Amino acid sequence: MKKKLTSLALAGAFLCLSFHGNVQAQESSGNKIHFINVQEGGSDAIILESNGHFAMVDTGEDYDFPDGSDSRYPWREGIETSYKHVLTDRVSRHLKELGVQKLDFILVTHTHSDHIGNVDELLSTYPVDRVYLKKYSDNRITNSERLWDNLYGYDKVLQTAAEKGVS
């Protein structure tokens, strides 16, 4: 438990520092932050690297979206279908380039599809010790135009985490 809290605190510190300009670690420190995004805005993913350990903060948009045939996941205006904000391939390529074999944790800042989208793919591809995310509720979204496919992505994460035994 103490190790997980330390990891979470480290992730929080890295995240806070990322809002104050460029963060640079000494070459010998073994600590790096890798930012992956699309130039047009929207989808982001952050890989934290520390002495051979890896974690992620947000995972970017994925290729999956509901088609509206399931009443739990209605078609909504604003669901990204053009793939211009998808980070699945970039995240996968970057993790491979870094030699990642396992993720200590994935921290999702909020459950919009452009932050949670690739969690299920990562859980299916890599061993992950823990996923940190808030319980989803449409009530937290004050602008109905931003409901998108958030619940769909959230449910996919829960299903894949349960299948992989990740809490």
Explain the meaning of each model-derived region.
Residues 2-3, 18, 22-167:
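Non-globular, low-confidence helical/coil segments that flank catalytic cores
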